[in-house]
Amino acid sequence: IGEMTTVDPRQPVLILGGFLITAEAYAPMAAWLKQLGVFDAHVVPVTRLEWLLTTWGFGWRRVLDRVDALVQQLQASSPTGRVTLIGHSSGGVMLRLYLSDEPVLGRGYHGATRCDRLITLGSPHQAVRATPLRLLVDRRFPGCYEPGVDYVAIAGELDLNGDNASSFSRRTASGSYKSIAGDAELSGDGLVPVESALLKGARHLVQPDTAHGGFFGKLWYGSLQRLESWWTFVTND
């Protein structure tokens, strides 16, 4: 577990979204954080084609190169000299690799020298079945690998029989949970099981009635009604 570090909640934030989700889905989150007093908040622009390319290492590198450029831009104007990272779904797993200085994909990013907090939202950290690159991250950089970084893992619990759940999540959630964690009966956000999203050693929050994304339910991690809850948890450390 990394040493606890004091993080300024107002320092700039960079958001990396989830697989096949484009930046506009996170624009309300960035705007809300700025209204709350965060110095600046940006979303990493990634097209759907670029997400499809993350099946391969060069696709990860392309996205993380963009993360690195934006982090350095935000760092230059940060009152603390540091940046907070938010990763949704697969983005949260990718950012764990970004924090490391090990040249796994032919380049070490040294992200932990610039970023002292990583918040993950419904990220499939621990899985019995995952893509090779996600497995590599959890094998090479298990848990809270970088000392001095405050890792916070947010999981959602979605009642599949409740009003929030979409018909899609009702049909597919149990199959997703079985695929990721080996058990169709687990609780989760409609895609990622709670036990997979709670990164080992991180600060944990299980958020009720929260879907993985807009496709899975009306209220998800990026909905303003949910944002305030997990952001309050993160910053009241």
What are these regions, as identified by a protein language model?
Residues 1-237:
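Lipid deacylating catalytic domains
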